[in-house]
């Protein structure tokens, strides 16, 4: 059967549609973002061979990332939940918006390349498009134009998103300090600062903090029967509530990078910035290595009081997941918060907090701190 009306394709698969019909499904799903995407005279919205988007002076930020079925998500997890198209579309966009945010910029446009097996339900594709729109709208990227993309077929779902961004008028923040600041960082060190949640937002919409996405992944990858066995073995007071479990799973499937805080970091004069995608420890060590210099790199040390505060809410979920809450905080990835360096005298923007110190090699270690292990996610296993 060939479906000629994509709107009537509720039970159809990708293999039932022509390319034009499938493209119509996607474009219909993206229509709200295209309609609200501020396409001024002289630009070209999606539908042609290429889109034409406005370009600012001072360059364009570009980031690309991919999500693959079987590597980055499963349609059905061992624990039981499914990855809906909305979840995959949301996360594919969120992780790229996070990269632009980490440079202090504002996303201006995105394109998506989507590879689909012929057996993929059309409803899943429609939901994927809705997830793209949802992420752009609800994460706070109103100026990000959905500029088009590409569709193809393959053995597994694969989504690659490229985001363009406008740099902040005050410049960009990198993981390497500016040359004028590098010598002082190497000699004196600097404060490690972190941001996860937007200040003043609704509590229900706030991201839960470092470690929760990794806890969600650990739960999703555990067989449902095993989770039930573990829960039965725990005292009732030590079992996480359904709300806590949902919070962890949601942190993994629908991350919420704090998009307003990257530009705020530029305005405040932070020295460096990057997003926490592979784990607080691994990314902090990357930042330390990027400080430059010919001698040993400075080392990140974590404030023990901050670690205890961040780990405490994870205790019950971590126990069910079979993980240490402290290890989830320091080594869990995909939280998409912000990690940076600041001088002790710098007034931090709301939403940022000091979590430790970058300590020069051979310098006295700060009291009440512990070394931050270089733990986290490496897709190549190294």
Segments predicted by a language model, with ranges:
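Internal active-site segments that recognize and position negatively charged phosphoryl groups
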Residues: 190-193, 245, 251-280
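Glycine-/charge-enriched secondary-structure boundary and capping motifs
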Residues: 1-34, 81-84, 117-145, 152-159, ...
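N-terminal glycine-rich phosphate/pyrophosphate-binding loops that anchor nucleotide-derived ligands
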Residues: 2-101, 142-144
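Glycine-rich anion-binding loops of enzyme active sites
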Residues: 108-223
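Small-aliphatic-rich amphipathic alpha-helix that forms the alpha element of a beta-alpha
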Residues: 84-110, 130-141, 173, 177, ...
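Residue-level signal for inorganic ion chemistry
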Residues: 52, 96, 104, 146, ...
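A short, charged helix-loop
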Residues: 228-254, 315
């Amino acid at each position: 059967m060939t479906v000629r009306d994509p709107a009537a394709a509720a039970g159809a698969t990708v293999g039932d549609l022509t390319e034009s019909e499938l493209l119509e499904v996607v474009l219909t799903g993206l229509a709200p973002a295209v309609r609200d995407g501020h396409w001024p005279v002289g630009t070209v919205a999606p539908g042609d061979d290429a889109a034409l988007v406005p370009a600012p002076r001072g360059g364009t930020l570009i980031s690309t990332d991919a999500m693959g079925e079987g590597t980055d998500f499963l349609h059905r997890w061992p624990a039981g939940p499914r990855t809906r198209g909305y979840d995959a579309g949301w996360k594919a966009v969120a992780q790229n918006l996070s990269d632009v945010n980490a440079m202090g910029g504002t996303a201006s446009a995105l394109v998506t390349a989507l590879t689909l097996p012929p057996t993929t339900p059309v409803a899943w594709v429609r939901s994927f498009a809705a997830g793209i729109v949802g992420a752009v709208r609800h994460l706070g990227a109103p100026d990000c134009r959905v500029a088009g993309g590409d569709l193809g077929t393959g053995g597994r779902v694969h989504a690659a998103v490229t985001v363009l961004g406008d740099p902040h008028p005050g410049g960009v923040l990198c993981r390497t300090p500016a040359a004028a600041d590098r010598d002082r960082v190497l000699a004196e060190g600097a404060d490690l600062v972190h941001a996860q949640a937007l200040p003043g937002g609704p509590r229900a919409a706030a991201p839960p903090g470092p470690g929760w996405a990794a806890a969600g992944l650990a739960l999703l990858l555990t067989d449902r029967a095993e989770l039930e066995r573990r829960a039965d073995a725990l005292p009732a007071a030590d079992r996480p509530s359904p709300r806590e479990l949902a919070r962890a799973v949601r942190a993994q499937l629908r991350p919420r990078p704090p998009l307003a805080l990257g530009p705020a970091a530029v305005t405040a004069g932070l020295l460096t910035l990057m997003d926490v995608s592979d784990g607080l420890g691994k990314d902090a060590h990357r930042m330390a290595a990027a400080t430059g210099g010919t001698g040993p790199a400075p080392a990140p040390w974590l404030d023990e009081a901050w670690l205890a505060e961040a780990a405490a809410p994870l205790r019950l979920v971590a126990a069910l997941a079979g993980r240490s809450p402290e290890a989830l905080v320091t080594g869990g990835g995909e939280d998409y918060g912000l990690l940076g360096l600041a001088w002790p005298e710098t007034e931090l923007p709301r939403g940022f907090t000091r979590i430790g110190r970058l300590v020069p090699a051979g310098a006295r270690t700060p009291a009440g701190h512990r070394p931050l292990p270089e733990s986290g996610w490496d897709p190549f296993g190294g």
